[in-house]
Amino acid sequence: MWFSGTSNPEQRARLERVRGLTSATSYGLYHELTLNPVGPVFPNTDKLNPFAVPRIREALNWLIDRRHIASEIMGGLGSPRYFPIATVFPDYARLADVARRLELAYAPNPERARAVITEEMQKLGATLVGGKWQFRGAPVTLTFLIRTEDERRRIGDYIAGLLEAIGFTVERRYGTSRDLAPLWIGGDPAEGRWHLYTGGWITTLISRDEADNFDFFYTKR
């Protein structure tokens, strides 16, 4: 029998009690938040995309508490990750001093996140009315594609709640990989059909050089 991945501590404990069944800790599975960078207004629409602004994308690092996700949502079966390189692979060890400085710089700071996002939203011409962001007379609605097969549903709900708390209206669109892939990876981001997606990836081997991950996640291609 082959079983891969769980974020349920009780399930893990049951597996460990089964005689003759071996298990190992794997660091290959990781989740990330994919953001649509088109904009700041989607072409041929009045729909604002705040994530076209680099400072708003950056501010999400202060808004989201990775440690909460790892300890509470994943039941302690995960660890916070800030970069597209695995923390247990050689590249991270080589960059540990720089990585640690960045991890401290982007530690959770909700008030700073709110301040930066507020400043940038006002620059875009959005206004906060009754605690909700509006743009050209309509609520700023973020379409959030949330995977349902695993802990990403709870991660998505957690992040959606944070965004709603600072004034965004969030349309939570739940679905499986089959449901959502045509939108975020098979469609044109400029169509404005989504703003965020709960991405998930897996590393199947120990890599000595993960430099191409920066190209994959951070450049246009």
Where are these predicted regions, by residue range?
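Outer-membrane beta-barrel and related beta-rich outer-membrane complex signature
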Residues: 83-88
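Extracytoplasmic/periplasmic ligand-capture domains
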Residues: 1-73, 89-221
